[in-house]
């Protein structure tokens, strides 16, 4: 079973830094003797203290607000937080993350000896018992906790409906809280909480749920969300609608455009089966709908449908006994509203079967790519589990043994599996043989009495007595690691990867490895399009639990919909672009566009000004005196609008719109490819013989050895922790607000004397070696000695917590000791890279466009010396990559270009590998050609950037010592690279 490994991502670090920079600080001016409450915050109870954090779906806001609580506790002593979410589903998602072992282990490396106590209030916790009205134990635990316990953070997790319920405001309980209070709300007021709101668009200031938050009198509110509520200002002609931010703008803004363009989420491919024109034009508009009556209109034809009446009586195309159920709902749970279009042809079973078949095909196209990962003889790339999610309209069609959907899906899936098994029985590469076994296990499970290939989760499943259904629900909701794993602890294949739901999983649940979402029903209301694709936006994790970033392995979500939603792609793009910080005005150059251009240009040229920009556009005759774009401008024989020319000359503006390749509409799923100019790459063949060799890190033996460091670190008894098991208490309770039964759940530790069984010694040792990249023979002697002599053979100390402690301690010591004490030892074999096939000993014909560059310039002028066919020109950053790629180099530069990711793969002493950004071949008259490798970095480098530069510098120094004519340069600007090239042409060493 795999373990998810959280990591610090740059955008999450930036969000955290922005929040802390916006925090108003602690008010030390007033004496405070209330140890049950948070310290006093400056500007408390005022919007000046409140903070807004805008983060797009799938970018990790749950991680950020969880870590924020740790930070505020560590730096300022704040220890009581109320986390308010809009729905029970989102509450469950937050609870699962905060209490997960992988999250606790991750945060423990930054906040030692600090634990987070999560108190969750569920429906039914206030239920009267034996005639007494008692407070929930979780509420008492939260309010009564004192700041004298300096190692514990108290978090109360509650959904909006519960916070606004009568149970929270009544004051006739038979127990008391702080100071003799008998009202939960007043008890929370006394704690002076910090409130964190998830999904703030559900909490507009004028609604009852926000008022319920205000009732507990938070000192400070921090809101996290992709969208925020609107506020109307002014009246009549002066009326305007803006986003309701506490300080009129968010303190951190990671919008949808940046999230997609920067590769922080998956790209999206949208598909729908076409309908014959006759069926496509046969559509009914919902003219009006009430609780008892539905009025449909088609042209001049009006049809009235009452409760319980069949839509097939209106049009035979409405197959499947679809009735009007009343309350603005069809019997298939489709929500209706005036103006909606219903296309009868999309309700038929044959049409839905097309979508199912397409989803299965898309699933296995993606699964093969994710499993095989380039599929070469030397294939060490970790596999990626592929999941698919189906939104359906009828539970019976899936849950019943002979349900139409279940029977159809299994029939189509068995057929596909049989075809693939036949194909792979003729293949011989190791990873292909593994995949054949995975397919065979899947088919065998599908034929068994208790198949483990697909599972469903529906709202009606809550409290079900069916053990098989409950096992499915637990796997989907709670066992994320199991769904992401390829095998269990016994080595058996984990074949479950197809999930079915209504809209129950639309929010609060996520799994990063969802690559296909198929909607077999319309979502009805005009909900956010980003929210609909949100379950599949997160970047995937591989079988080792590591997040797989776009530059490492491009990932896309296939989103399958019906013909009636074929405008989905354009609506999604519009929604994303509306979220941009700068809205591009195609009629006139406005102040926001000018500011964006000038700000970006000044990063390269500090002397660039607004006046210089306007003079340039005026000289090119792109704008008139009022800064309006001219409709037609001819330059170099080509005619475009002034706005189109502006985008070409100032591509910085394209950052304000989502890139065209991030969302594709009904196009083939083949990945975008870039063709190599083989004749130019061949000029690099001699140097590539060296680059494609495998290299081993060799550490200096001076000072402490690896054995000594391992011994010093692993002999620390404090690293060895026996893990306490937790117990989950569940009971069926009645929700006072809606009368429905729900499962209330509480988690806590078992008796202190009971500890969980540890890992098997061999497995623990192997995991430690994998995580630290240290040889087993270095770790084994000291680990075995500790277990035998100090821990008295108690294998319970071989826990996940111990493993995490040792990994962190070893990496810290090794990084500090060997940062400058290593070199590269060439090995006697080559290995394939992203651009070179070591088996064929030649460069590839084409490669994935994503690993060359995320951005595209379709109008770049071709240069025959480039490594790729142009146009289009692909790049990652406007500065300094774009000027480097567009520069007219001296004739002595015979080849140049941007290197794709993983083209060389220089090992880093911290693990992983790195590749420089650019390569140049420079011919000199009286000497051999020299090869220049360039790594571009921002002036304000991060620690990780310095590690990359150190690794590359050492690597190329090693090659030079072998008399290989290679030079390395680091640069923060294009002029610095031009200067280096001119120096090399003149025969100067870099």
From Swiss-Prot:
It holds the Pfam family ResIII. Residues 884-970 form the VRR-NUC domain. It catalyses: Endonucleolytic cleavage of DNA to give specific double-stranded fragments with terminal 5'-phosphates. Signal peptide: none annotated. Its cofactor is Mg(2+); S-adenosyl-L-methionine. GO terms for molecular function: ATP binding; DNA binding; helicase activity; type III site-specific deoxyribonuclease activity. Residues 50-545 are annotated as: Helicase-like domain. Its EC number is 3.1.21.5. Residues 913-937 are annotated as: Endonuclease domain. Belongs to the type III restriction-modification system Res protein family. This is Type III restriction-modification enzyme StyLTI Res subunit. It comes from Salmonella typhimurium (strain LT2 / SGSC1412 / ATCC 700720). The lineage of its organism: Bacteria, Pseudomonadati, Pseudomonadota, Gammaproteobacteria, Enterobacterales.
């Amino acid at each position: 079973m795999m373990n998810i490994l959280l990591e610090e991502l740059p955008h999450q670090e930036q969000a955290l830094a922005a929040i802390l920079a916006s925090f108003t600080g602690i008010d030390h001016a007033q004496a405070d003797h209330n140890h049950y409450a948070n310290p006093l915050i400056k500007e408390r109870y005022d919007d000046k203290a409140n903070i807004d954090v805008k983060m797009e779906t799938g970018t990790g806001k749950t991680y950020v607000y969880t870590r924020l609580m740790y930070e505020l506790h560590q730096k300022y002593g704040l220890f009581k937080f109320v986390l308010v979410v809009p729905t029970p589903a989102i509450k469950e998602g937050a609870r699962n993350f905060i209490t997960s072992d992988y999250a606790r282990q991750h945060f423990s490396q930054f906040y030692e000896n600090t634990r987070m106590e999560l108190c969750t209030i569920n429906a039914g916790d206030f239920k009267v018992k034996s005639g007494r009205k008692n407070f929930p134990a979780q509420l008492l635990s939260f309010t009564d906790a004192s700041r004298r316990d300096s190692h514990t953070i108290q978090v109360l997790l509650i959904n909006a409906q519960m916070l606004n319920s009568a149970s929270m405001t009544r004051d006739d309980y038979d127990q008391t809280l702080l100071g003799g209070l008998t009202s939960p709300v007043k008890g929370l007021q006394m704690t002076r909480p910090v409130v964190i709101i998830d999904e703030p668009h559900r909490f507009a200031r004028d609604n009852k749920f926000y008022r319920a938050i205000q009732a507990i009198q938070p000192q400070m509110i921090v809101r996290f969300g992709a969208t925020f509520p609107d506020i109307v200002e002014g009246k009549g002609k002066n009326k305007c609608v803006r986003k309701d931010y506490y300080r009129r703008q968010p303190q951190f803004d990671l919008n949808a455009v940046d999230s997609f363009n920067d590769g922080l989420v998956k790209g999206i491919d949208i598909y729908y089966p076409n309908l014959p024109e006759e069926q496509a034009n046969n559509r009914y508009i919902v003219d009006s709908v009430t609780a008892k009556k539905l009025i449909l209109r088609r042209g001049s034809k009006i049809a009235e449908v009452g409760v319980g009446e069949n839509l097939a009586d209106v049009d035979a195309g409405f197959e499947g006994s679809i009735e009007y159920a009343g309350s603005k709902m069809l019997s298939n749970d489709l929500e209706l509203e005036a103006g909606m279009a219903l296309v009868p042809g999309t309700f038929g079973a044959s049409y839905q079967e097309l979508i199912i078949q397409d989803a299965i095909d898309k699933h296995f196209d993606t699964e093969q790519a994710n499993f095989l990962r380039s599929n070469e003889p030397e294939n060490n790339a970790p596999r990626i589990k592929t999941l698919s999610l189906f939104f359906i309209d009828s539970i019976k069609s899936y849950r019943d043994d002979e349900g139409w959907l279940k029977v159809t899906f299994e029939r189509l899936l068995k057929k596909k599996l049989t075809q693939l098994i036949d194909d792979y029985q003729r293949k011989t590469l190791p990873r292909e043989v593994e995949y054949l076994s995975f397919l065979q296990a899947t088919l065998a499970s599908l034929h068994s009495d208790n198949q483990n290939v697909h599972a469903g989760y529906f709202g009606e499943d809550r409290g079900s007595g069916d053990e098989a259904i409950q096992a499915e629900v637990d796997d989907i909701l709670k066992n994320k690691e199991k769904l992401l794993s390829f095998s269990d602890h016994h080595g058996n294949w984990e074949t479950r990867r197809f999930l079915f739901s209504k809209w129950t999983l639309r929010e609060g649940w996520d799994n990063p490895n969802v690559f296909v979402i198929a909607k077999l029903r319309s979502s009805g209301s005009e909900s956010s399009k980003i929210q609909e694709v949100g379950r599949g936006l997160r970047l995937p994790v591989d079988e080792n639990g590591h997040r797989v970033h776009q530059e490492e392995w491009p990932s896309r979500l296939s989103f399958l919909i019906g013909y009636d939603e074929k405008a989905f792609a354009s609506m999604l793009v519009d929604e994303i672009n509306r979220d941009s910080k700068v809205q591009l005005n195609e009629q006139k150059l406005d102040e926001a566009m000018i500011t964006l251009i000038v700000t970006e240009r000044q990063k390269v040229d500090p002397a660039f000004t607004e006046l210089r920009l306007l003079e340039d556009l005026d000289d090119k005759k792109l704008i008139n005196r009022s800064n309006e774009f001219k409709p037609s401008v001819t330059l170099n024989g080509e005619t475009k609008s002034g706005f189109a020319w502006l985008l070409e000359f100032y591509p910085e503006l394209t950052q304000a719109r989502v890139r065209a390749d991030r969302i594709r509409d009904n196009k083939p799923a083949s990945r975008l490819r870039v063709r190599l100019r083989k004749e130019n790459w061949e000029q690099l063949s001699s140097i590539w013989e060296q680059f494609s060799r495998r290299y081993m890190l060799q550490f200096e033996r001076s000072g402490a050895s690896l054995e000594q460091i391992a011994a010093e670190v692993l002999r620390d008894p404090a690293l060895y922790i026996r893990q306490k098991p937790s117990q989950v208490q569940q009971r069926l309770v009645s929700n006072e607000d809606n009368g429905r039964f729900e499962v209330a759940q509480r988690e806590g530790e078992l008796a202190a004397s009971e500890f969980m069984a540890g890992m098997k010694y061999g497995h623990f040792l192997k995991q430690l070696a994998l995580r630290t990249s240290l040889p087993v023979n270095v770790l084994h002697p000291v680990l075995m000695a500790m277990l035998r002599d100090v821990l008295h053979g108690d294998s319970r100390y071989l826990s996940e917590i111990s493993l995490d402690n040792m990994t962190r301690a070893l990496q810290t010591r090794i990084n500090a000791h060997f940062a400058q004490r290593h070199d590269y030892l060439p090995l006697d074999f080559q290995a394939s890279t992203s651009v070179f096939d070591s088996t064929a000993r030649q460069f590839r014909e084409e490669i994935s466009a994503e690993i060359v560059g995320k951005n595209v310039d379709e109008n770049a002028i071709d240069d025959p010396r480039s490594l790729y066919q142009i146009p289009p020109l692909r790049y990652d950053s406007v500065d300094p990559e774009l000027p480097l790629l567009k520069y007219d180099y001296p004739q002595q530069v015979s080849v140049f270009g941007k290197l794709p990711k993983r083209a060389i793969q220089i090992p880093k002493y911290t693990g992983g590998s790195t590749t420089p950004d650019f390569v140049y071949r420079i011919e000199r008259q009286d000497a051999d050609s020299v090869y220049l490798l360039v790594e571009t970095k921002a002036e304000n480098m991060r620690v990780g950037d310095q590690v990359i530069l150190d690794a590359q510098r050492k690597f190329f120094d090693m090659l030079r010592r072998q008399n290989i004519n290679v030079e390395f340069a680091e640069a923060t600007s294009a002029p610095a690279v031009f200067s280096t090239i001119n120096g090399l042409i003149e025969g100067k060493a870099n």
